[in-house]
Amino acid sequence: MNILGRLGGALLGGSFAVFGYGAVRDPAALAKLAGPALEEIRKVVPLPKDDELLVRVNGAVQTGAGAALAIGLFPRTSALALAGSLIPTTYAGHPFWTIEDPAQRKAQRTQFLKNAAMLGGLLVVAGAGRKGAASGTGISAG
């Protein structure tokens, strides 16, 4: 991976590692925020009822995969794990479509779109081929 790829991985992965660690250490506020979305998801997916446990597990995934991406360890796998954890995080954490107040709605929409951009970056990393491998993306991780 070139210097820009390493720097990008460090910045992208590092932010997930920091926020994930915070979720593992103190899940209460995030669990409360995620509660309504988790109840909706439970209608179609059998999830444990312990919202704090789910927040901690998600935080652990983000911590581990974020740290791995930050140091360049298994970047494609790490990026896929982060992408998989970011989708429910974004849905639960930034439901701008449910907010009446225009200022709060705009702020949550901004955070939702920021997460969507991060998801895009993760998908670019995940889709990057190994040096010499054909991936169809035109992007090489090596």
Identify the meaning behind each predicted range.
Residues M1-G142:
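Short amphipathic, positively biased membrane-proximal segments
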